[in-house]
């Protein structure tokens, strides 16, 4: 009888553990405002992310803003006007680099926006101040730089490998350097909320082609978070199919190079550590046939058990 009771208790514990794993809440909500890597100006790189229990979003890059908000409203992600989402829900912007497909939405929507902080590393911030918000290309909506600053946006420079609070949110960010046609830089952002993390990479080429060790250093930094299961997902670009020659990658990844890099990450994090891990594929470049090919190649080459997410504009998902 005692043995039966012990077995019953074990079965109950196993069932409870299984149930708790199934109902475990997601750490972050993501709303893609733009997902493509070119041509379609109404659907360029921009991702809202927030802890699952808040509506205080930070925008990861800002290629497209308003069109993405309107699409999200169509999909009933937001039950508010586009103006309210822009002005009240988006608490700030993290800009990985200053290429137009990552900043054009920020620039165009700045007159209608509310006061908030724009975060970027020094090189990116200088480009935006000197070439965009300069009273020539566009009014200076910042609080520093050339021309007459209108002081709507606070321009905050991020130091690499230094944790910075994101104003008016529960989150912090740590910036890491990426190589995007060496010696030009892009940025990865490690977002933290409590004990949970998400990693977003701006445009990047593979270390082998870029002749850099930026990704290796990034993988080394985040490997412990993979092991501890605190990192809930990685946003990373795949711009071209494998047929794209190295000399025409222009600081981007293919499925082959992404998998090579993720194998390097698995070496650091441990065997099978990426099984079931969420990888959000960003920056797919048209034409449509190339995007189809990229997805097929990723599926074929996925020998790590990764869970690929192909985000759609205006459709939210969880990490």
Language-model regions: role of each:
Residues 46, 50, 157-227:
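Catalytic core of the metallo-beta-lactamase
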Residues 19-42, 47-63, 123-186, 193-202, 303-318:
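Metallo-beta-lactamase
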Residues 208-312:
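Cap/insert and terminal regions of metallo-dependent hydrolase folds
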Residues 39-94, 104-111, 210, 214-222:
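Pre-active-site segment of Zn-dependent metallo-hydrolases
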Residues 80-149:
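Active-site HxH/HxHxD metal-binding segment of metal-dependent hydrolases
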Residues 1-24:
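Bacterial Sec-dependent N-terminal signal peptides
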